[in-house]
Amino acid sequence: MEEHTQGSHVEAGIVEHPNAEDFGHARTLPTDTNWFKHAVFYEVLVRAFYDSNADGIGDLRGLTEKLDYIKWLGVDCLWLPPFYDSPLRDGGYDIRDFYKVLPEFGTVDDFVTLLDAAHRRGIRIITDLVMNHTSDQHEWFQESRHNPDGPYGDFYVWSDTSDRYPDARIIFVDTEESNWTFDPVRRQFYWHRFFSHQPDLNYDNPAVQEAMLDVLRFWLDLGIDGFRLDAVPYLFEREGTNCENLPETHAFLKRCRKAIDDEYPGRVLLAEANQWPADVVAYFGDPDTGGDECHMAFHFPLMPRIFMAVRRESRFPISEILAQTPPIPDTAQWGIFLRNHDELTLEMVTDEERDYMYAEYAKDPRMKANVGIRRRLAPLLENDRNQIELFTALLLSLPGSPVLYYGDEIGMGDIIWLGDRDSVRTPMQWTPDRNAGFSKATPGRLYLPPNQDAVYGYHSVNVEAQLDSSSSLLNWTRNMLAVRSRHDAFAVGTFRELGGSNPSVLAYIREVTRQQGDGGAKTDAVLCVNNLSRFPQPIELNLQQWAGYIPVEMTGYVEFPSIGQLPYLLTLPGHGFYWFQLREPDPEPGAQQ
């Protein structure tokens, strides 16, 4: 269908927005309020995945063409960073129009086509919604600065002085000297927690809250499965506070959740709150109600500690952060990840830990960005296949729903001489042909060059080559996702660390019990044992609770000796791991059922 409404426009000082009824709607999947707990997420940058029209930029139609690959891999949900209309001064997180798709990506109808095709394959799609701020080119901001007494005059946080909220930290210390910027048109300062071209919305204005709820409903009406709410801790400002995690923010999130539960059951809100776990759990809402704010939240502090634990060859960085993680409501789930489109953030570590991570993983100053490291997974791990597999096994087995980053399943590298975080946002490497099979455009027109490194370049690292090799990282990753999908324990099971005398080995049980139709119960118990050392390591585990059970290695279905009363001895190769299903012993022949 031809799109006849090209985004928002201003009429008589009022910004008019299109209606979802102006567009087609994607088919919906059966309502399942717990799907996100079982899902494997896959973050893909639209511009980086596949170019359908040879303009050098990936687009929505190109992503639609590659859905069969995503389905084959075993992904349950795509996470798309912002694809809205934007001047692209911050990778699309500076939104110019919430109701329009960036023209180089396509149209709203192209998105509906993508969503419908994904749902036909059983794949869900969530996208980022930047609630905290807009681009300074957004019509709301332009109306606000030109007409202070008009309907949008109070849509942003304005002040005659830059002295307000002095306790709020500056997030982008590399580029910003203040959270206030003077506007020569309105002759006032405006508030921004991020870049100065991203003014913060004023959520103390009820009209702003209603406007953002309307944005939610527009995309939900089209059929989208949920949103990652970007930068949610910063929605409100109060004197005498650091302007983060304020009660008013949680009150607004409860409004968003109620709209979802009442009008769009089965859709999901994921909080992006780069905070300590004790602070983040508040974004799940009231545990007595099962959670009444966000369904999911990222566990940011866990990720750097996985890297730290393996480099230190000690389980304690992981053990300690998990021990500090409070319980979450029954309806909630953590999202966990190794890498994404941003730098490997080191905000949630101590100064000493940050220095250690820089020394170990960012020896070249160009590898640093803001308070983090701008590298992909494979180069961070020196392209060591054993380490890559160990990290992936941890990602897939620790508590939470895992998020993969496009290209990590084939071991893509980065280009550190590209600016800002573009080093980890290069084109997907499909084939060894020109432009890595990403685009038919002339190479000079590509949005970023494909990686041509001797180790990580597309001539050697690409999907086509790895599809043909049964031992490739791609096929190994697909197999691990398939194994994980067969066991509810990974998705919703309890987590119990087993300790042990060897600090280089991290062992834990994931366990869930399901009621059966005959009134009985069935337990799915998985034992995960991870060697964080580069050297072979022995471990003795107290498994008396499982005496008589048989550990069955889950990738090769190999039975290990049954568990007895004595400590269970295992030896793991360097950076090796085991996943065991603990299987009940078969009944003795002739035993009564």
Curated annotation (Swiss-Prot):
Stated regulation of activity: The amylase activity is stimulated by addition of Ca(2+), but this cation and other divalent cations inhibit the trehalose synthase activity. In addition, trehalose synthase activity, but not amylase activity, is strongly inhibited, and in a competitive manner, by validoxylamine. On the other hand, amylase, but not trehalose synthase activity, is inhibited by the known transition-state amylase inhibitor, acarbose, suggesting the possibility of two different active sites.
Active site feature: D230, E272
Disulphide linkage map: none
Disruption of the gene: reported phenotype: Cells lacking this gene do not accumulate increased amounts of glycogen in the presence of trehalose and show only a small effect in alpha-glucan. Combined inactivation of treS with glgB or glgC completely blocks alpha-glucan production.
Keyword Calcium annotated: yes
The entry's keywords: Calcium, Carbohydrate metabolism, Glycogen biosynthesis, Glycogen metabolism, Glycosidase, Hydrolase, Isomerase, Metal-binding, Polysaccharide degradation
Annotated catalysed reactions: D-maltose = alpha,alpha-trehalose; Endohydrolysis of (1->4)-alpha-D-glucosidic linkages in polysaccharides containing three or more (1->4)-alpha-linked D-glucose units
pH dependence: Optimum pH is between 6.0-6.2 for the amylase activity and 7.0 for the trehalose synthase activity.
GO molecular function: alpha-amylase activity; calcium ion binding; maltose alpha-D-glucosyltransferase activity
Residue numbers binding Ca(2+): N132, D200, Y234, L235, E237
GO biological process, one term: glycogen biosynthetic process
Annotated family: Belongs to the glycosyl hydrolase 13 family. TreS subfamily.
Subunit structure: Homohexamer.
Protein name, as recorded: Trehalose synthase/amylase TreS
Lineage per the UniProt record: Bacteria, Bacillati, Actinomycetota, Actinomycetes, Mycobacteriales
